[in-house]
Amino acid sequence: MSTDFILAVDQGTTSSRAIIFDKKGNIRKIAQKEFTQIYPKSGWVEHDAMEIWGTQSGVMREALEFGRVKPDQIAAIGITNQRETVVVWDKETGDPVYNAIVWQCRRTSSICDEIKRDPQFVKYIKENTGLVVDAYFSGTKVKWILDNVEGAREKANAGKLLMGTIDTWLIWNLTRGKVHATDYSNASRTMLFNINSLEWDKKILDYLNIPESMLPEVKNSSEVFGVTDSHTLGGAEIPIAGVAGDQHAALFGHCCFEKGMAKNTYGTGCFALMNVGDKPVYSDEGLLTTIAWAENGKPTYALEGSVFIAGAVIQWIRDGLGLVRSAEDSEYYATKIDSTNGVYLVPAFVGLGTPYWDMYARGTIVGITRDTKREHIIRAALEAIAYQAKDVLECMKEDTGLDLAGLRVDGGAVQNNFLMQFQSDILQSEISKPKINEITGLGAVFLAGLAVGFWKDKQELKSILTTEKVFEPQKDSQAVAHDYRGWKKAVERSKAWAECYS
């Protein structure tokens, strides 16, 4: 039987998904299942690792069944996953010793504070992992499990425990324990991996007291990791051939293969990544340096910036203020007026991310007069999403010296044509919206397909990624500069608010 399809395993923070793609990039079937979010204490977030595996294997079988695709028609599997979330499990039984600690979890802040008392070590971590010291990343989460779960430290020292990010956990289960591996992109998000020497960093491992025997083998993002166990998917041994963290997979799915190409994902927040080529670029502007993907032992690096509140500000004007009935209504109201009339909304509801990194900033609306109507507030909320993206992309230009070679976009908010046009105006750059919505899954199958010869090269991938709409700047640069100065002034008003008035 011919292998006509590739299966994307898309394991996210709130749901497990499986997507079957054909050779033209068309989607044959999507299956999705949400799973439990566990909050043991304030600021703590966990997932049941067995539930993750159960839901993920379930949706894979469901996609095959309802897509009417036989397992032996699948040429390869590509995995993309929520990053930084980590699992520690028993090497013999395969049972987790504790729940997966999720990327959002802040329980290891005190460990990070302790590390920060040593500025030289903080500098070492940034220069060698590309990351800042933060509870966000996997390393301190592993230390917490070893220090706090009874018997874990002893078992780890005896070589009886394994650890891995979610991709590693899925690969282990798909192969029934035959393969313990990760890819370069996921490894680069652990705060344990040296992105210069491309190996686990012994100095950091020793500092956190994590035995190297726990760590997975690091492989290329496009490479055959192993095959599914014959009992996993209807008897077929399917190559697992592509692996990348979700944001990295999206960059690859957008075909951002050249230096200076960037993508922005508009979800609850925003994640912007720029391809910076075959050498790491370290940021003076609060960006993270990461490995985008690796092929044939050669990494491609990226700069990453994150915005905490993007689409969530539209949810707020809908649910919190009642200014719109649906997110779609925001475009209608924003286009009823020509401008915000000097109103700016800074959605710093949980502080500000890149490049400000102010956890005490709070949401602010400035420029209100008696003439201000709800349309002005709604438009200001949408414009804030674009301004924040510009903040991040300006930092990338500053750090790299590269001009933005257009911006590829994905996520729910890209359906808002007003927002996309304003984004193009404020960046003075072309914005490309693809026809395919499932860009993250597409990136995973692109990586897998290249590894098994399903697609011959990146040129063929580019022909699959078709553009639905291109937005060109319609506003002159002087007007843009004037509006952006106003945004910067509004941001200054929002800073340190909770510090002063809490």
From Swiss-Prot:
Keyword RNA-binding tagged: no
User: NCBIfam families, per this entry?
Assistant: glycerol_kin, PRK00047.1
Task: Answer yes or no on keyword Nucleotide-binding.
Answer: yes
Q: Which positions bind glycerol?
A: R83, E84, Y136, D246, Q247
Q: What is the similarity comment for this entry?
A: Belongs to the FGGY kinase family.
Pathway where this protein functions: Polyol metabolism; glycerol degradation via glycerol kinase pathway; sn-glycerol 3-phosphate from glycerol: step 1/1
Q: What reaction does this catalyse?
A: glycerol + ATP = sn-glycerol 3-phosphate + ADP + H(+)
| Any GO MF annotation of the entry | glycerol kinase activity
Q: Which organism is it from?
A: Francisella tularensis subsp. tularensis (strain WY96-3418)
Query: Which CDD domains does the UniProt record give?
Result: FGGY_EcGK_like
**Where along the chain is sn-glycerol 3-phosphate bound?**
T13, R83, E84, Y136, D246
- Residues bound to ATP: T13, T14, S15, T268, G311, Q315, G412
Give, as one word, the top-level EC class: transferase
Task: Give EC number(s), comma-separated.
Answer: 2.7.1.30
Know the name of this protein? Glycerol kinase
GO annotations under biological process? glycerol catabolic process; glycerol metabolic process; glycerol-3-phosphate metabolic process
As for what it does, the entry says:
Key enzyme in the regulation of glycerol uptake and metabolism. Catalyzes the phosphorylation of glycerol to yield sn-glycerol 3-phosphate.
What InterPro entries does the entry give?
ATPase_NBD (IPR043129), Carb_kinase_FGGY (IPR000577), Carb_kinase_FGGY_CS (IPR018483), FGGY_C (IPR018485), FGGY_N (IPR018484), Glycerol_kin (IPR005999)
Highest taxon, organism lineage: Bacteria
Gene designation per UniProt: glpK
Q: Name one GO cellular component term.
A: cytosol
Record keywords: ATP-binding, Glycerol metabolism, Kinase, Nucleotide-binding, Transferase
Annotated ADP binding lies at T13, R17, T268, G311, G412, N416
Instruction: Summarize the activity regulation.
Output: Inhibited by fructose 1,6-bisphosphate (FBP).
